Each structure stands twice: as structure tokens, then as C-alpha cells.
């Protein structure tokens, strides 16, 4: 078997394993969130379908598939149908460059634990996060509903604003690792994670990805008491389900980005690297759920002021301090 064919087979196998794992993880993350929030609110959460509610994601899938798929009469039909797919597909494509562990030795060759190890993997992730805005904005615009349109506009303004802060937060990481490759960035943290090396950048990035996820306290695009359900007000059936799955896939992507850039990736004692990676990503997801259950929603003016007046200046200051430190160190 020639090398090209073997490489292609390995890529297909890795693609299938990654997609199957992240889709299953996203489904059960919904269940975990409902269980955790139930306990925080002194409720049981879902516990009827299967042992302890373990089959609840399957029941939810069947329910969404059986619901009528309605399209508003005055909606832009094709854009309305395309928007949920954009949100889901951009989240799935992001997993192509995320390294889940150290390379394995298989068939006398090194097998990277990543579908495609790009030299510009970090730029690829940011490009996809920018494209994800279109799914939300187009979904709100195409619905021909004032509530959906306002939700879409809010989401677009929020995501663009906090993407700037997120981009500024990763500059010190790139300066330290001297590479846009996610694998190289993880390997640069073998002795010390970037969370300790760049604590201010870690704080900025953490807040920015919380805003990118559109979850409490940054859930202005879906503020129920103001906008019914925000940008997906007019969606039903599996199209609503695609937005829902896309949200949790995006949560896993953002947790993976935080793990790779600041938490040391797969590095950790005793356990295999992929186990440490999963533990860190799930820890970030639990933090997001905990914040959702305990924090109130910000006002829209507070949200935008915090992004532009606090995070962006802090990000610029952090870049200058990091550059001065690197020059002084030589």
C-alpha cells in the first residue's frame, strides 16, 4: 500500500472518529447542562427516558425530527433554510485542525492526533469563527420577523466586537510560540501553560469566548424576555435543532481553543494525553454551565462597553508588555 493511499485512509478514519465523538458529546452536553442546572435549582432534571435519563438526547432528536418544519410565508426561503446549516457546518469544520493528543506511532510512522495539521491552524479557526456570524445574522434577517432581526443584529455586533478582543488575546501566545500551528503552540507549553505565562491574555480570551458562545451573561441575541427567542424565533423542527446542535458544537470548539492556547493541550501527569485534553475541555464546558446558572444577563450597553472600553485596551496593553518582555529577554 503506497503512502498516499494509507494517508487518505487514516484521514477518513480520523474524520469519522472525530465527527462521531463530537456529535455524541454535544448531544450529551445538553443532557449534562439540564442535569447540572436542575441540581443548582433544586430540581432533578431529565430522568425519565432510559436509566437516569441517559436516552434523553435520543428522545429530543426524535421529537425534533417529528415536528413540522414551518417556513414563514414572507421569509427569504433559501436563505432561511441555509442559515442553520452554516452555523453547524462551520463548527464541525473547526475540528479539522484541533490537536487532541501527542502523535502516535502506528505502522512504523508517526500519526498526528489531528485531522489536518495546518501551519496556519489558528488563522483557520478564526476564519471559521468569523463565518459562523453569517449563520446567525442570515437566520435573523431571512425570517422576516422584527424579533429575529433584532436578535441577529445583536448577535452580529456582539460576535464581531468580541472577536477583536479574542484576536488581541492570542497575539502574545503566538509571539511566545513563534508559530500559528496549534500543535506548536501546545508543545511550547510543555513546561508551563500559557494560562500562567499570560494570565491577562487568558482572562481576556475567556471572557471573549463566553461572549462568542452567546450564553449567559452574554445571551443578548436570545434574550427571552425581550426578543421571544432571538434570531431563531421563527425556526422549528430540525432546522431549530441544527441551530441548537451548532451552539453546543461551538461550545466544544471554544473549550478546545482555550485548552490548546492556554491550558497546555494534552499535557498532564499519569493519564494519556487525549484523556487530559477531554478533561480540560469538559472542565471549561462545566465552567460555562456554572456561569449560566449563577450570573445575571448584562444590559446591551454594558456588553458593548465592556468589550470596546475594557477588553480591547487591555489586549493592546498586554501585547505591548509581552513584546517588551520578549525584547528584554532577548
Swiss-Prot record:
Subcellular localization is given as: Cell inner membrane
Report whether Iron shows up as a keyword of the record.
Answer: no
Coiled-coil segments on the chain, per record = none
Give the transmembrane region(s): 5-25, 78-98, 120-140, 155-175, 191-211, 243-263, 271-291, 308-328
What InterPro entries does the record point to?
Answer: NADH_UbQ_OxRdtase_su1/FPO (IPR001694), NADH_UbQ_OxRdtase_su1_CS (IPR018086)
Its GO CC terms?
plasma membrane
Question: How does the UniProt record describe the way this protein sits in the membrane?
Answer: Multi-pass membrane protein
What function does this protein fulfil?
NDH-1 shuttles electrons from NADH, via FMN and iron-sulfur (Fe-S) centers, to quinones in the respiratory chain. The immediate electron acceptor for the enzyme in this species is believed to be ubiquinone. Couples the redox reaction to proton translocation (for every two electrons transferred, four hydrogen ions are translocated across the cytoplasmic membrane), and thus conserves the redox energy in a proton gradient. This subunit may bind ubiquinone.
User: What is the name of the protein in this document?
Assistant: NADH-quinone oxidoreductase subunit H
Could you tell me which species this protein originates from?
Syntrophotalea carbinolica (strain DSM 2380 / NBRC 103641 / GraBd1)
Amino acid at each position: 500500500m503506497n503512502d498516499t493511499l494509507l494517508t487518505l485512509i487514516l484521514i477518513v478514519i480520523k474524520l469519522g472518529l472525530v465527527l462521531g465523538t463530537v456529535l455524541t458529546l454535544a448531544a450529551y452536553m445538553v443532557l449534562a447542562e439540564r442535569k447540572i442546572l436542575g441540581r443548582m435549582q433544586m430540581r432533578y432534571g431529565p430522568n425519565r427516558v432510559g436509566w437516569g435519563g441517559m436516552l434523553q438526547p435520543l428522545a429530543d432528536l426524535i421529537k425534533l425530527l417529528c415536528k413540522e418544519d414551518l417556513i414563514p410565508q414572507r421569509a427569504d426561503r433559501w436563505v432561511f433554510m441555509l442559515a442553520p446549516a452554516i452555523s453547524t457546518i462551520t463548527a464541525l469544520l473547526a475540528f479539522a485542525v484541533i490537536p487532541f493528543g501527542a502523535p502516535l506511532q502506528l505502522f512504523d510512522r508517526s500519526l498526528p492526533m489531528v485531522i489536518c495539521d495546518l501551519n496556519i491552524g489558528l488563522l483557520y479557526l478564526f476564519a471559521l469563527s468569523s463565518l459562523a456570524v453569517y449563520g446567525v445574522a442570515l437566520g435573523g434577517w431571512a425570517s422576516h420577523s422584527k424579533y429575529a432581526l433584532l436578535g441577529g443584529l445583536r448577535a452580529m455586533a456582539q460576535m464581531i466586537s468580541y472577536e477583536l478582543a479574542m484576536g488581541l488575546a492570542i497575539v502574545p501566545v503566538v509571539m511566545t510560540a513563534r508559530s500559528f500551528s496549534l500543535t506548536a503552540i501546545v508543545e511550547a507549553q510543555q513546561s508551563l501553560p500559557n494560562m500562567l505565562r499570560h494570565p491577562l491574555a487568558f482572562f481576556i480570551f475567556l471572557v471573549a469566548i463566553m461572549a462568542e458562545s452567546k450564553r449567559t451573561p452574554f445571551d443578548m441575541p436570545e434574550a427571552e424576555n425581550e426578543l421571544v427567542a432571538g434570531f431563531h424565533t421563527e425556526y422549528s423542527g430540525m432546522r431549530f435543532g441544527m441551530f441548537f446542535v451548532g451552539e453546543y458544537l461551538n461550545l466544544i470548539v471554544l473549550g478546545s481553543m482555550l485548552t490548546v492556547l492556554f491550558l497546555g493541550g494534552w499535557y498532564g501527569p499519569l493519564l494519556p494525553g487525549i484523556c487530559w485534553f477531554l478533561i480540560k475541555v469538559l472542565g471549561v464546558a462545566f465552567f460555562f454551565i456554572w456561569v449560566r446558572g449563577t450570573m445575571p444577563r448584562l444590559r446591551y450597553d454594558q456588553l458593548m462597553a465592556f468589550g470596546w472600553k475594557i477588553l480591547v485596551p487591555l489586549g493592546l496593553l498586554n501585547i505591548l508588555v509581552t513584546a517588551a518582555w520578549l525584547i528584554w529577554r532577548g
